[in-house]
Amino acid sequence: IISSKSAAAKRAGVQLRAVVTTSLTEFPPEDIVVIIGNALDNAIRAAQESNGKTADLHIQPQGAYSSILVANDVLKPVLTENPELNTTKKARMRHGFGIQNMRKAVERNQGMMRFYESNNRFVCDILLLN
């Protein structure tokens, strides 16, 4: 999934930097694909519209959890204007399910997910219980 999203980022003119220091093999592969795939799709799309055009993925152990952190540059604050993170795509009936699906996958794996912004970056911070 990371290779595929890295290629997509490159096509979009976005630099995707990935640091992976732990495997996620104890989790259902379909949940990992939903979580990482949607998080990176969103990050790449937002970074493409930003000045910095970078997105980062960090997967690492954090105590009893596995941490998945995806961050991207943003042009303007996201959460102030769109706190529910509703889709901004024109075809709203076909879009807007990514974050919902991510939440369900995180919950199935006894995890937690939060979104925040810092230094002109949007961050999706996920912890999954090992």
What residue ranges belong to the model's regions?
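Conserved short strand/loop->alpha-helix "switch" segment adjacent to the catalytic nucleotide/phosphoryl-transfer site
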Residues: 16-36
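Conserved ATP-binding N-box helix of the HATPase_c
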Residues: 29-52, 105
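Short beta-strand/loop element within the Bergerat-fold HATPase_c
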Residues: 50, 54-64
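Glycine-rich nucleotide-binding loop
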Residues: 76, 118-125
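Conserved glycine-/histidine-rich ATP-lid loop and adjacent helix of the Bergerat-fold HATPase_c
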Residues: 101-111
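Short beta-to-alpha transition helix within the HATPase_c
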Residues: 1-12, 66
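Heptad-repeat coiled-coil segments of the DHp/HisKA dimerization-phosphoacceptor module
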Residues: 16-22, 61-63, 74, 117
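Glycine-rich/acidic phosphate-handling loop/turn and adjacent ATP-lid/helix
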Residues: 66-97
